[in-house]
Amino acid sequence: MTIKVLVVDDSALIRNLLGKMIEADSELSLVGMAADAYMAKDMVNQHRPDVITLDIEMPKVDGLTFLDRLMKARPTAVVMISSLTEEGADATFNALALGAVDFIPKPKLDSPQDFNEYQDLILEKIKSAAHAKLKTQRAAPAVVVQPSHKPALSNRVINTQLVAIGASTGGTEAILSLLQQFPAVMPPIVITQHMPPGFTRTFAERLNKLTRLNVKQAEDGERLLPCYVYIAPGDQHLEVIKVGGSFKTRLTQGDKVSGHRPSVDVLFNSVAECAGANTTAAILTGMGKDGADGMALIDEQGGKTFAQGEQSCVVFGMPREAIKRGVIHHVVELPQLADKMLNYLASLKRD
């Protein structure tokens, strides 16, 4: 069975470009192309697509309004096509909160190589979206619990432990849900979420507003502090190194690792090397296997490893791969994951 795809975009150029890319793949079937939400609504009812690529900025009815109505009337896997602006990034994260599975920036195709890379990426995202769990099918997010009900962490734990998190497809909302469950006082947290340049700063700002922690996009060479969360910038690997008695960030433009830059494996490997048994790591929803090798090294060095359970994942690929390797100590659905991690940290020897 081929995957039925509907393209919704007010630009004829983008519609035709995406249409040609989809038609070139034997696993996909282009069932329609719509220039606005009204045409899209009719085509959704007529063709019942498996996946919709949806432009955020459209005339008459914008992409977010259409997405909200779609998710209430006929939940469908949606990949947002996003503009590389601050407003576009904000709208993208709102779309993911409404239930879109994934997003990709609008194409900037200055060379044949750009075209081929973009085609590979959009086709991969469409296929992944077709097999993703929609918001209505996943375990409900946890209700945010007040800090007084969370176990207190010792000063030694706060100042010696590192928390590392990796995610891909579905990760933006999973990370938000997880961080909202954490109290304001935590060891430093480092996160790699697969995301293109131009979106990670807005993502960090969003998390900073919606959680008790101080969240920022990581900069090169900064000292990791308790109560802070550091997000890997798009298109740069985030590593942690130890300088003297302090953990510091290192950003690099090295080759893609496990198919990605930033790579979860790069982050996890670095944390395993410099923090060892003082590492608490979680691998969340995502396509592929990035993070499995790094989790193996964290396990080998004596750190504690967690994986998000299948029922709450948008895509179970990354957690499944790490679980298959036998390097995950606890598999926990997202609503309970923060409590499990906090209980572990609270159980460590007090000062």
UniProtKB/Swiss-Prot annotation:
4-aspartylphosphate-modified residues are D55
Residue stretches making up the CheB-type methylesterase domain: 156-348
- Hydrolase recorded as keyword: yes
According to its UniProt entry, the protein's GO biological process terms are: chemotaxis
Is this entry keyworded Oxidoreductase?
no
Gene Ontology MF, one: phosphorelay response regulator activity
**Could you tell me the keywords of this UniProt record?**
Chemotaxis, Cytoplasm, Hydrolase, Phosphoprotein
Q: Which residues form the active site?
A: S168, H194, D290
The record's listing under Gene3D superfamilies reads: 3.40.50.2300, Methylesterase CheB, C-terminal domain
Entry EC number(s): 3.1.1.61, 3.5.1.44
Q: Which InterPro entries match?
A: CheB-like, CheB_C, CheY-like_superfamily, Sig_transdc_resp-reg_Me-estase, Sig_transdc_resp-reg_receiver
- The residue ranges of the Response regulatory domain are 4-121
Q: Which PANTHER family match?
A: PROTEIN-GLUTAMATE METHYLESTERASE/PROTEIN-GLUTAMINE GLUTAMINASE (PTHR42872), PROTEIN-GLUTAMATE METHYLESTERASE_PROTEIN-GLUTAMINE GLUTAMINASE (PTHR42872:SF6)
The free-text domain remark for this protein reads:
Contains a C-terminal catalytic domain, and an N-terminal region which modulates catalytic activity.
Name the UniProt record assigns to this protein: Protein-glutamate methylesterase/protein-glutamine glutaminase 2
This chain's source organism reads: Shewanella sp. (strain MR-7)
